[in-house]
């Protein structure tokens, strides 16, 4: 328990140190030293490994009589002299405590001077890093900064794989090269609905996809007939849609009943005929225009006929009045102009018999 308390105290002091090289040394010592030395059997005495011997030869040799199994330099401060006292131990089992997990060496962090990766021989990695820190001050400062980042909670979590529940997983690469993805992208590119896109079949109601028995499939209005085509100049050219005989017959019968369609009626008629509402609306507009022109022409013809009949009747009535005057007997007290007109009309109709009538009338008047 004393060793555990000492380790916790040194770990807390390592975070509080202001010198980066000292913080690096203490963090490496914490990674090297186990928390429970009594739980692990000591290593059998034997010759040191080649890596530790090479690292110890490169580092300055400690004074004789001092026990320094890790190859670390004795710390300059007296409060940190208990770091090298526990012997180096290798874990015989896998501890799962919180302190054990936190004391595990973290993954190497990419920096100016990379730390050596964690391996079973912790003494060789720590001794080599301490030797490089003592050889060059610049390398020691970089290693200290990297060790401080590794010893911090962010550095401990840096080597772990990151999983974010808020970010969705990356989509498979085939999504961007499939026809369905291209259709979805086309909807984003074109603001019009999918029924009006070039080369796309219109989206009808579910019952319209199964054509009714009275509809002729050969003469039915196909979606490509009303699609947008491009001229050789690159300009848009709208083709005129053609309708089947059954569709025109139903439209004409509906137009005879009513000249204008409300919204629900237009939608119902378009659904029953397999047409779009815009097609029905445009057809009724064109049909009303045609009906107005035809009605205006008929009215003009009827007016002309009525005017001609009126003139004929007027002329006939005038002739009848003249005939009535001619058929009446001659009044001797009438004016000379009227008598002259009657004589001229009589000459034109009967020839030379007018003189006889005149002579015959004179004796009667004289007597």
Swiss-Prot record:
Pfam families, A to Z: Homeodomain
Residues found modified as Asymmetric dimethylarginine: 189
Low complexity bias spans: 48-59, 78-91, 110-133
Sequence intervals crossing the membrane: none
Region listing for Disordered, in residue ranges: 36-133, 294-367
SMART domains (UniProt xref): HOX
GO BP of this protein: animal organ morphogenesis; cell differentiation; cellular response to cytokine stimulus; cellular response to peptide hormone stimulus; central nervous system neuron differentiation; glucose mediated signaling pathway; negative regulation of oligodendrocyte differentiation; negative regulation of transcription by RNA polymerase II
Any single Gene Ontology cellular-component annotation: extracellular exosome
GO molecular function: chromatin binding; DNA-binding transcription activator activity, RNA polymerase II-specific; DNA-binding transcription factor activity, RNA polymerase II-specific; DNA-binding transcription repressor activity, RNA polymerase II-specific; RNA polymerase II cis-regulatory region sequence-specific DNA binding; RNA polymerase II-specific DNA-binding transcription factor binding
Highest taxon above the source species: Eukaryota
Ranges for region Involved in DNA-binding: 306-367
Name of the protein this chain belongs to: Homeobox protein Nkx-6.1
